[in-house]
Amino acid sequence: MGIKGLSQLIADIAPFAVKEGEIKQFFGRKVAIDASMCLYQFLIAVRAEGAQLTSVDGETTSHLMGTFYRTIRLLENGIKPVYVFDGKPPDLKSGELNKRAERREEAQKALDKATEAGATEDIEKFNRRLVKVTKHHANEAKELLRLMGVPYVEAPCEAEAQCAALVRAGKVYATATEDMDALTFGSNILLRHLTFSEARKMPVQEFAYEKVLKGFELTQDEFIDLCILLGCDYCDTIRGIGPKKAIELINKHRSIEKILEHLDRQKYIVPEGWNYEQARKLFKEPEVQDADTIELKWSEPDEEGLVKFLCGDRQFNEDRIRSGAKKILKTKNTATQGRLDSFFKVLPSTGTPKRKVDEKKPLAGSSAKKAKTGGATRGRKPK
């Protein structure tokens, strides 16, 4: 889900924190990509006659085709991608995962009815709602990336948190995902739509975290509390509080604790046993691998390995795969020109910390000075 309504709230209050541009503007950049989000996009979008692409054995291959060609597109535009895969979901996410499972059950029932009625459009719609990225999909994508010479990272927990840690450490420029909670985890830069198909003709959106804080007049801690009020994957929300009210309350009271002290409990229903404190801790102290221990290396593609992996049972066209491998090799051999700012050392951010898997460190910089700009307008947009 990400953070409910956050992108629209930023557009309303801090539009200067968002830039739109083309993929070519990120030439020379290293970008950490939320792999699960990408695979989901590919499973939804890469289809033939409304159905996912499959091998001779009926195994889905849409995620492989999407990963192969979209990654080549990034490389041809001078971008060095590193894919970050989710690890074990945090316990706090169990409620959200249960809700997703229930929605899939409802979609399956609706699909059965649509199939019985022969409603083609409804069949395709509900089929898309049933899409789920599995461990098998992820493992196949990892093998493909290895053969392409593109690095990937296995996060111990949430991929967005690991991406943010890589950004803060100066290992990569930005996090690429559609989930706005990358900002809540402290990613200095968030890129949306980077891995979208060119056919969709949607500009890449670049969100600057520090500018968001400035526009909202919030510290990092206050921004996290705002995101919890808006709605995240880790706890319920207070019924009756939308985006406009949430930013108003945070600007006035500065924390959820103070909000609860002054809240009209008759008008706004607080969830019983609301675990907002645990959600806050998860955002401030996410379980991530120390970015300093991660080595990112882009190598030459294994053309024969790619042909063996993708052709044959998976039925990819050999000529196209060989052509793709040569394109990857060409980008590696010709990508010697860097960005002007790459001649200067990128210093790790000190604004938001990381912690190793076995360490717990508090979030630094949470007492950042508040800026003096902004106002609030209600907005709502899904992740």
UniProtKB/Swiss-Prot annotation:
DNA binds at residues 47, 70, 158, 231, 233. Structure-specific nuclease with 5'-flap endonuclease and 5'-3' exonuclease activities involved in DNA replication and repair. During DNA replication, cleaves the 5'-overhanging flap structure that is generated by displacement synthesis when DNA polymerase encounters the 5'-end of a downstream Okazaki fragment. It enters the flap from the 5'-end and then tracks to cleave the flap base, leaving a nick for ligation. Also involved in the long patch base excision repair (LP-BER) pathway, by cleaving within the apurinic/apyrimidinic (AP) site-terminated flap. Belongs to the XPG/RAD2 endonuclease family. FEN1 subfamily. Its EC number is 3.1.-.-. Interacts with PCNA. Three molecules of FEN1 bind to one PCNA trimer with each molecule binding to one PCNA monomer. PCNA stimulates the nuclease activity without altering cleavage specificity. Keywords: DNA damage, DNA repair, DNA replication, Endonuclease, Exonuclease, Hydrolase, Magnesium, Metal-binding, Mitochondrion, Nuclease, Nucleus, Phosphoprotein. Mg(2+) 2 binds at residues 179, 181, 233. Residues 336-344 are annotated as: Interaction with PCNA. One of its GO terms (biological process) is DNA replication, removal of RNA primer. One of its GO terms (molecular function) is 5'-flap endonuclease activity. This is Flap endonuclease 1. GO terms for cellular component: mitochondrion; nucleolus; nucleoplasm; nucleus. The gene is Fen1. The lineage of its organism: Eukaryota, Metazoa, Ecdysozoa, Arthropoda, Hexapoda. It comes from Anopheles gambiae. CDD domains: PIN_FEN1 (cd09867). Phosphorylated. Phosphorylation upon DNA damage induces relocalization to the nuclear plasma. Mg(2+) 1 binds at residues 34, 86, 158, 160. Its main location: nucleus. The keyword Mitochondrion applies. Residues 1-104 are annotated as: N-domain. Residues 122-253 are annotated as: I-domain. Pfam families: XPG_I (PF00867), XPG_N (PF00752). It is found in: Nucleus, Nucleolus; Nucleus, Nucleoplasm; Mitochondrion.
